[in-house]
Amino acid sequence: MSLANFFNEIAFKWQKEWENSKVYEANPETDKPKKFITVAFPYTNSPLHIGHGRTYITADIYARYLRMKGYNVLFPFAFQFTGTPILSISESVKRGDEEIISTFVNIYQIPKEEIEKFSDPTYLAEYFKNNMKNTAKKLGLGIDWRREFTTVDPIFEKFVQWQYRKLMELGYIKREDSPVAYCPRDEFPVGMHDTKGDVEPEITDLDGIYFPSGDYFFIAATPRPETIFGAVALLVNPEADYVIATDSLNRKVIISRQAYDKLKYQISFREEGEKKGKDLVGMIAKNPVTEKEIKVLPSKFVDPSIGTGVVMAVPSHEPLHYIALTELKEEFELIPVIKTDELGELPGVEAVGLAQTRNPAELKDYIDTIYRIEYHKGIMREDLVDLVPNFMKEFVKDKIAGKLVKDAREKTRELLDMLNSRITIYEISNGPVYCRCGAEIVVKVIKGQWFIDYSNPIWKTSVLKSLDKINFIPTDSKKEMEKIIFNLQPRAFTRSRGLGVRLPWDEKEIIDSLSDSTIYTAFYTIVHKLKYPISLLSDKFWDYILLDRGTADEISKELGIPKEQLEEIKSEFKYWYPVDSRHSGRDLIQNHLPYYLFHHFAIFGEKFLPRQIVTNGFIRVGGKKMSKSFGNIYPLNRAIDEYGVETVRIALTSTSSISDDIEFNSNIAKSIAEQLKKIHDLISKLLEIEGVNERRDPDVWLLSIFRRYIEDVDKAYENLDLRTVYMTVYYTIYETIKDYIELTNAKINKDIIKKVISIWLRLMAPITPHLAEELWHKMSNTFVVKEKFPSINEVEYNEKSLLKVEYLRSIIEDVNRLSSELGKEAEKVVIYVNDDNNLRELLKKAIIAIKDRKSLRDFMIENNVDDKTARRIYELANVLPSTIRDLIVTTDIDEEEVIVQNINFLMNKLDLREMIVYSSTDEKAPNILGKKDLALPYKPGIAIL
């Protein structure tokens, strides 16, 4: 039987037992403290992959740990049906999208007859909901499944609609014409979760300036309209296609084909014809501000997909423009517009040298520097007044000339608006970004779009202040959250079609998936009790249950719901809320988590904000983040089948710190599985040994060191330092038990080994609950997952016994290190121990001095000791293993006696033929390789022969 099958057989057996015994169904217990753990629920548009697994297993481990610590733990789960991801996949299947269908067939192993049914988005969502639930169960997640729901359940819709009426009352909802990222194929606004690669489309604005040219107008796009005074040419790409279109004022405008295909979603254009870029070259246009005639010139550096595909050339301040015009060998004028102390009069000209070096990065840095300095420190030149016609001179003199660039920019826009020569153009600044359907995202100006006003200063400030009351794991995620919240702007939150909750006051609009998933964690606390007709769940019902408004008598009388049931529902909400630990991937810091906090603060105030937010890194496969484009999506079901549940639980959570990405590969998984099998076999074997009753130093040492393990692992679980838990529980303890067996010559103390195994299994139960349960039942009939977490009070602590064995282990480590440095295997070892009591006392004082942060000089003066001795002892105190250093301050051992009594153990561990022990103070002892002179207390001199 493969290791995967071996562990899965164990896992599935205990999962059934736990489910039958309702182990994870949590109900209020007023005499017991609670912990409410939640994870960001998944989109049901494909099966769960190992990236999901990291977040869900981490939360499950934490929930299991807290349950064992005596808390009443609720860990629920639900499914996101809302919005465009599901609809996009469904429509892709309907179109016969080969990439999507191939992914379902080849990666997720879904039968083709099922895939054909995915053209119905509801069927698709239900299919993957059931698939995800089965996977979550296979993972061993301790979910209270009574509380599951989907975001299209009618009862959930009532809950969300109540929330949005509250937000409207509070003034956080507004409606306006505004640019949004938009999929032209699916015809709805999109966000991060709607795009390939989960890229958040970022919108920036440009100024489109009209340059008249006979019967036409070229529209040139620029981020720096104030430089128009220095525009001396228009540049077009001679190889590109250009469109002649009529605007709302019946002006015939010229822009690139690619620009037209994007801008038609923002501006009222009507296509009239088409021209090649090369046919536009030679036309004469007019600068609308200076009224100077300027040429239309060819330049392949013009990207027809950016802006309008027409560039106004300002060579005096734009290095690329200067380079382009220079390459044409055309005569052109250089008109300085902005002056600064840092840059020359014509900074664009200075780029020639950089261009000749052919160093694009250096040139880009120079251009960015020009933009930054001119915007923040630049002043518009006074002589700009001389460049404009008389009717503009007064405006330019009063509003633009001599003014700071950042102020003049707005005034230049005002001037262009008065001339009816400017429009605002929106671009995807981090484009191209693609919808999941494959279409490139554009910007569309939507009339009457509904927004949540995350820019509201009072709301935003309140949320920022509240972050101090939340514990963040990892801690640096708080700073990232602060930055995101500070920069949040109003966000479009409705779609015109798709699955989801209807906007209560505009039912043709659907609330999007990031906006109906903000306070849904409150819904978990009561959903299993809401068995009433939808019509009864009015706003007054939610106000009473969630906001404690009104009385049970009033609500009962109005809705016909028994008073006792209302009070019970409200009591359950108040018992569980707020969330004690909110878990997600770190990508959700960009959107979901800030929205989660904003909405909680708006609806509930500060008291119901989550007490902790945990964000984990990603899973990488083949050294890359999982992506369909890389072909490295790894379904969770496949991982479980290939490696086993317990292996997957460790591999996805515990081989790295929580903030770091984890590499998932076959070698790592197989290594974990093999170690788990070793642990299984070792414990099984130990429980069969009859053992002895005699208590010896190794027995007491084992109990004492387990006290330390309990402390370390407890702290690590609390801080979600799962790597420390993993290394301690699955490797360090395993090696410790093996050392114990060797120290006792396999004559184990039966009572002590059972006690230690009991502790070991409970330490591993949060991460590998199935393995722990299987082995626990060789000792007990109770469920280990319901047992108490180990306490240090369960084991006795003897410093002397602990020091003896830790001293032996340090010798083993030193011999191995020396062998490695010498490049040879040790066969014979000579050990010199230093039993000078004066030096031993001095070492204790050195350890205390270092703890008190005293310098070497202070230590020497206080103890009246010579420089050489003080330095050696002080340095030793610094490098001794902490396991020894902390003990020798309060206890002591006879080093030579300890080595002699355990010489067989040392020789077996080191695979030695011979070991000899001398006292370094024995004058008759030989000084082999000078090691006798090097011996210090607890740091013997070691000669390898």
From Swiss-Prot:
Q: Where is this motif: 'KMSKS' region?
A: 625-629
Q: Does the keyword Amino-acid biosynthesis apply?
A: no
Where would I look for the motif 'HIGH' region in this sequence? 42-52
InterPro entries in UniProt: aa-tRNA-synth_Ia, Leu-tRNA-lgase_arc, Leu-tRNA-synth_Ia_arc/euk, M/V/L/I-tRNA-synth_anticd-bd, Rossmann-like_a/b/a_fold, tRNAsynth_Ia_anticodon-bd, Val/Leu/Ile-tRNA-synth_edit
Tell me the Gene Ontology biological-process terms attached to this UniProt entry: leucyl-tRNA aminoacylation
Q: What is its EC number?
A: 6.1.1.4
Q: Tell me the first and last residues of the signal peptide.
A: none
Location relative to the cell: Cytoplasm
**Catalytic EC class:** ligase
Q: Which GO terms describe its cellular component?
A: cytoplasm
Recorded hits in SUPFAM superfamilies, A to Z, give: Anticodon-binding domain of a subclass of class I aminoacyl-tRNA synthetases, Nucleotidylyl transferase, ValRS/IleRS/LeuRS editing domain
Q: Which reaction does it catalyse?
A: tRNA(Leu) + L-leucine + ATP = L-leucyl-tRNA(Leu) + AMP + diphosphate
Q: Which UniProt keywords apply?
A: Aminoacyl-tRNA synthetase, ATP-binding, Cytoplasm, Ligase, Nucleotide-binding, Protein biosynthesis
Q: Which GO molecular function terms does the record list?
A: aminoacyl-tRNA deacylase activity; ATP binding; leucine-tRNA ligase activity
User: Which is an annotated Pfam family here?
Assistant: tRNA-synt_1
NCBIfam families, alphabetized: leuS_arch, PRK12300.1
Q: What family is this protein classified in?
A: Belongs to the class-I aminoacyl-tRNA synthetase family.
For this protein, the record's HAMAP family field holds: Leu_tRNA_synth_A (MF_00049_A)
- Entry protein name: Leucine--tRNA ligase 1
- Give the source species: Sulfurisphaera tokodaii (strain DSM 16993 / JCM 10545 / NBRC 100140 / 7)
Q: What is the lineage of its organism?
A: Archaea, Thermoproteota, Thermoprotei, Sulfolobales, Sulfolobaceae
